[in-house]
Amino acid sequence: MSHNTFGHLFRVTTFGESHGVAIGCVVDGCPPQLALTVEEIQRDLDRRRPGQSRFTTQRQEADQVKILSGVMETASGQVTTGAPIALLIENTDQRSKDYSEIKDKFRPGHADFTYEAKYGLRDYRGGGRSSARETATRVAAGAIARKIVPGVTVRGALVQMGPHRIDREKWDWNEIARNPFFCPDKDKAAFFESYLDGIRKSGSSIGAVIEVVAEGVPAGLGAPIYAKLDGDLAAALMSINAVKGVEIGAGFGAAELSGEDNADEMRSSSSNMGNNGPVFLSNHAGGILGGISTGQPVVARFAVKPTSSILSPRKTVDRNGADTDIFTKGRHDPCVGIRAVPVGEAMVACVLADHFLRHRGQVGPR
Amino acid sequence: MSHNTFGHLFRVTTFGESHGVAIGCVVDGCPPQLALTVEEIQRDLDRRRPGQSRFTTQRQEADQVKILSGVMETASGQVTTGAPIALLIENTDQRSKDYSEIKDKFRPGHADFTYEAKYGLRDYRGGGRSSARETATRVAAGAIARKIVPGVTVRGALVQMGPHRIDREKWDWNEIARNPFFCPDKDKAAFFESYLDGIRKSGSSIGAVIEVVAEGVPAGLGAPIYAKLDGDLAAALMSINAVKGVEIGAGFGAAELSGEDNADEMRSSSSNMGNNGPVFLSNHAGGILGGISTGQPVVARFAVKPTSSILSPRKTVDRNGADTDIFTKGRHDPCVGIRAVPVGEAMVACVLADHFLRHRGQVGPR
Amino acid sequence: MSHNTFGHLFRVTTFGESHGVAIGCVVDGCPPQLALTVEEIQRDLDRRRPGQSRFTTQRQEADQVKILSGVMETASGQVTTGAPIALLIENTDQRSKDYSEIKDKFRPGHADFTYEAKYGLRDYRGGGRSSARETATRVAAGAIARKIVPGVTVRGALVQMGPHRIDREKWDWNEIARNPFFCPDKDKAAFFESYLDGIRKSGSSIGAVIEVVAEGVPAGLGAPIYAKLDGDLAAALMSINAVKGVEIGAGFGAAELSGEDNADEMRSSSSNMGNNGPVFLSNHAGGILGGISTGQPVVARFAVKPTSSILSPRKTVDRNGADTDIFTKGRHDPCVGIRAVPVGEAMVACVLADHFLRHRGQVGPR
Amino acid sequence: MSHNTFGHLFRVTTFGESHGVAIGCVVDGCPPQLALTVEEIQRDLDRRRPGQSRFTTQRQEADQVKILSGVMETASGQVTTGAPIALLIENTDQRSKDYSEIKDKFRPGHADFTYEAKYGLRDYRGGGRSSARETATRVAAGAIARKIVPGVTVRGALVQMGPHRIDREKWDWNEIARNPFFCPDKDKAAFFESYLDGIRKSGSSIGAVIEVVAEGVPAGLGAPIYAKLDGDLAAALMSINAVKGVEIGAGFGAAELSGEDNADEMRSSSSNMGNNGPVFLSNHAGGILGGISTGQPVVARFAVKPTSSILSPRKTVDRNGADTDIFTKGRHDPCVGIRAVPVGEAMVACVLADHFLRHRGQVGPR
């Protein structure tokens, strides 16, 4: 069971609410003797941190992470021991505010009604457990996960905002760090600046599509049928707040293709195949066939809906079932998809780490 | 861990290869005292059975299921006992054939290379474990799952074939059983007949999109963060052979929407809210918010790639890494998406059954 | 969750009732390319098979096992493929009999009342799912498990029957196969023959203690805290029907020892320590410290209660709660502990296989 | 998988090392709307806390627990929300000391060698993760677990120290809190005082047996075959540091009994059977038959070996494989079994809570 845990051999359990004392996670199953410093984790957290531009929530959180367990100093620096690694991030900006507006009303598009329907009560302070704040702990866990599969690089990019898609011909990974959108298309990033400003100023919000690419994934990761690599990626990405769709490789586009166009042909690699497998002449598969990695880049995309916290009044009901209107005040992200980029990377890194360990266990060294 | 098992309280473990002795599954965790006959399971299996029209593989399989355990006769008929229910389907048409073409060559778009990369060998007879034949056992398990959540109806439909989408205004569930495509749009079904005939005769294949709708799902099913109802649906649907994308409700379309357009507003229901929750004025959420069901219909779609078994020669490599061409002979489905409809229904039914039991355990009767 | 499944990377799911059509299991997670024949599995099953002496139930079951999936013929013989291995044993001797005596009465010491309390009904035919017949499938799975840890030998012995313990000085593994009790002490075996004959003729029954020894277990198997090797062994052995106690190494005897007497001292091995670790000067630990194997033999013991199916009338209640007496007719084992020996071996083999794979995944090759 | 997690619907994940910054746990799956205060958890922790008498380690730890998440204030006090409850205990007395003696030598009877064999390194400071300090977090989790099964009381007692067993005729639960041994036999407690003083002063240690009794367990908890209530109890109790044996009810004594003596006869209860089931005339079963609770008290015992930290020099090897002697200085428990009493209670409470939720999910309200 895994309500607040994901993974099998590499397992992450998260805890904490938006406006509680602290959030954190326990990373269990990390192999021993991996070099790990708090700075490496902080670096990833800083990429997700709110309040870094006018395009994300103005909540100010330092998101300073502490390692509580699972590492020790050795002659060659701080390393993992094989024991569970607990990470803690204290909440500092839970802004004391008036909750009367949302305490008894269900915000449309949020999990207010469903948490109440499930549990009979809900933590209304900042969304409680359903807040995207929880994703900070995923990014922290992902920083550890990145170290597990030798040679893997996991990078994400915003490839669509509203109806506007990037020009794939202009894809430049170096651009990602140069704009506040993690956008790999320089021109589109410039456009998004004014586009999103308009949305922000009008108090509205907009959806986005994120693409995560993992390069250097060895062939053979994944497992048959119900532990497919793409099945686990789908669950992991769909578990991110506000995600409504996931696709691998050609994705929904594959529905429009013929077998000739879709199936990726192969040619022998110049080097020996044993190491690298064949050269694929295309990658509609997104690096996964039959649930198992092909050795090509793993490519996953996910759709993030617009945040439902907007500044215009909305029809809803209160806890007593009476009709009312609700008016969301306070800080919000005009495009929550932006900060989902490092979260998506983290989830992909965690899934790959887990499958790397599982594959090593199940099939082992030859 | 769950290589060949899915679910938690309602758990299904499947086994068997395309051309082996038999396929089957073990359904564990089914509550006791549910009426269950072999005919009910057979009825669902017959909907998926190959060879029923010229648009699916001509393999002839009776797909006769046997119940090996977990039920007993009582005064009120045959019921489940709470013990694991084992189901067995013998393979009858494993057509003795010449495997020399595919034994040492990797079919593009199939799991041939990846199984070999993972395991160092593969069962090349009809695809072995990676064959869609395994999905018959899912349909059998799904027939049991359908009985668990009181009042739930799970139905699927083919909503797109190649670039051709159905007209949603013409959606009629009664049409599903009247054409060989599970298509709810009568006119489009007529079109698909000639369209797919052309593809079939040319030895090509085409992708499709399937939509599954579950009505009568009570509010409150699902669980936070890593056991979200949509996360589990995404994993379950992505685990179906050839699926490359999954979306819930507005799905990828949500990326193009503003917060005003996307968030589903609420109004009080005329009856008491306790039972049914509010009336939602739209269903972009696809019946799920924060990973938990809203009480609206749960709507999931998945994209099925075109089968890679086509009649034109394709570039590939052999097991020794040498370049070669491969030419797939034999039976195939011109649109594997068609038979994925009952499989998709079964997966959704299984996920709902599992979450119903988990919710009952976790939150329980008030 | 694991009602009818055990293990994580090496997972066994069993099904079937005593008097149903068939019993069987699905072994998932077995590494590929292991040589495996049906004869190897049958050999282990034959050691557990009933009706082989007058000291076990006279039920006649051929216990012929079939492999339904997960293996294929290769140039070097039949091997595992990495796919789930389904094993099936048809029930042949479910003797048509009159169940009226036990249908509505709860047999003391059996699971009759508890199954009814849990499920609201029970399969009264031969004990249904709670029958020891299920253990045949464990022995079959164990035969596969034995092949996974290189160099491991798992052997069991009956070391106590009623109050009579074997003389450990006379322990000879070769004796195990020479008497119907799996007893390693030749003299005690001769005594047991007349002792158990007396019990059998009087229609009574007696308890026993079984010891399982696994030699060749590499140091390092097991995992911290809640996945300790001894924790998993305890659960696995306690899951065998009629087992009421489990101990490792000195076991309950350790409660009477001082720290000086109990802790196993170490000396360097003549060979290099890297391979074999230190030489331990005693083995009170039973080969496990901190939940992790030391490299010494793993020693586990379990207590089996006397069967509650005896020929004297017993006080009980019926399904309506009325007082009554019950008189068990029919076949029974005067000492069910005897046939628990191969079952205990199988469970230990399965736990070791699982931990071997988990260790390889978690820590991997250096 | 569950290296540092136990339970399924009620799940506990623990973290932290003996001499690290903090220890803690995440309790996931706790039902919502349970009243829970930090004082209730602290009360249980205080019973286990070291340094309360001269018979336990003199390490001074306040063991002040903080609740980081999963609760909220309501009109009727602080309650659980259904979100994961994170508990944190800061380490305060990690006494800066000289580790040179144990850093490179393996202490006999400890997990030093095995952790090193598994992970290639170990946290030698106070035993790191293998220290009994981890059990404080179990007691904290157990305090929550106690609230889940309505009407259940879980109490433990020390029933044997070295070869000295209590007189069961003198059992008085009220005595438990009146002596530093959790001993229910007043006279034996007085004896233990001088007995253990002798052992303590000589720098030696001694083993013990603990009995845990759960009253008010409803009939029907547990699950077939591999999720038996006794199987889970065995794993849970064996996972406590230094435990070498577990038994239920008559336990190993059952091996010496005949079927007539062992099987618990039944008589109708004066009240209606529906609620309470039959009256059992004895409880050799320890409240569990076929892995499912009978409604009688659940009785489990476990054997705790003497601590291996003693003041006389012991033969061992160092990390280089060279022979050496080791001399354990510092604080230790002369009988670690004493503090295992509240830990055993906590584990039993957790297993019962988990099975209560699972039963409710699986079988549900009728």
Swiss-Prot record, chains A, B, C, D:
What GO cellular component entries does it have?
Answer: cytosol
Report the cofactor remark: Reduced FMN (FMNH(2)).
Q: Record-annotated residues binding FMN? A: 129-131, 241-242, 290, 305-309, 331
**Gene3D superfamilies hit by this protein:** Chorismate synthase AroC
Look up the domain of life of the source. Answer: Bacteria
What is the enzyme's main class?
Answer: lyase
Which Pfam families does UniProt cross-reference here? Chorismate_synt
Q: Which reaction does it catalyse?
A: 5-O-(1-carboxyvinyl)-3-phosphoshikimate = chorismate + phosphate
**InterPro entries referenced in this protein's UniProt entry, alphabetically:** Chorismate_synth, Chorismate_synth_AroC_sf, Chorismate_synthase_CS
What HAMAP family does the record point to?
Chorismate_synth
Q: How does it assemble?
A: Homotetramer.
Describe the family membership recorded for this protein in Swiss-Prot or TrEMBL: Belongs to the chorismate synthase family.
Known role: This reaction introduces a second double bond into the aromatic ring system.
Name recorded for this polypeptide: Chorismate synthase
Q: Which organism is it from?
A: Nitrobacter hamburgensis (strain DSM 10229 / NCIMB 13809 / X14)
